[in-house]
Amino acid sequence: MRIGINPNRHALATGYKPYVASAVVHLPNFEGYHEHRFEVVKTSLTTMRENAGLDCDILIWDNGSCQEFRDWLLDEYKPDGAVLGPNVGLTSARAGLLRIVPPNTIIGLADDDMYYYPSWFKASVELMRQFPNVGQVSGWPVRTQMRWGNKTTLDWARRYAVLEEGKFIPEQWDRDFCTSIGREWDFHVHYTKGDMDKRITYQGKQAYAVAHHCQFICKAENLVEILRQNKEAMSDDKVLDNAVDGAGYLRLTTIDRYTRHIGNVLDAELKAPARRRH
């Protein structure tokens, strides 16, 4: 039986700041692949908050992690918001995060093994505002990401900006990428020998024509609308990249490296305070 209509049925989410940094975490145990990941995840979440460079809320979606991690998350880290539940997968978790915050929120979405340098969020927001019709901005320049999901960005750049192709990303960043995913350097050099960085200059501002799906910021309502029109958009990383591109949005990455992938073991250099990006 029901009498009347719930007055909050169509109410929008409130209570969050205009900027929200979020991550999806899955740390079920400390065995095998996950043996050293507690340190990785703690470093990721800590640098995400401490190095944002602007006032933002922290929202964590926990996908079935162990109790020890959840105790640390709630008792020590203390995010502004947290969703704790069974492992529903990255796709469902990210879609859920987008719907938790108000539509006009600029939200950062990330995996739980990213490292953040000072002012990562601030720099991404500034880039988003300097270019028109931006769908995503990442702080992690990766050459191989420029193979797909950027047709709209490249077409726009050829018409309204200056587009350059070359090897602009520093070799050390490329080596760091290989280390984080366990790829041999010599193989990587051969595998990517035909790949070029695609750099855009627009009104004096520069960006790469790509946005990495492991870490990016976006306006929540834009991705929610894409998901409404294409229910498969979050089903896979490349599918998401292509869906945002297909919706007519620019996908950009900062020229400086503001974020990077850690992997499942924290390297010695990342244990020091995050003071530099190079």
Predicted regions and their residues:
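Conserved catalytic core of nucleotide-sugar-dependent glycosyltransferases
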Residues: F121-A220
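Acidic helix N-cap motif at the loop->helix transition within catalytic regions
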Residues: Y33, C66-D75
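Short beta-strand-to-loop acidic/aromatic patch adjacent to the donor-nucleotide binding site
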Residues: N104-Y115
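A conserved acidic beta->alpha catalytic loop
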Residues: G53-L54, L59-R70
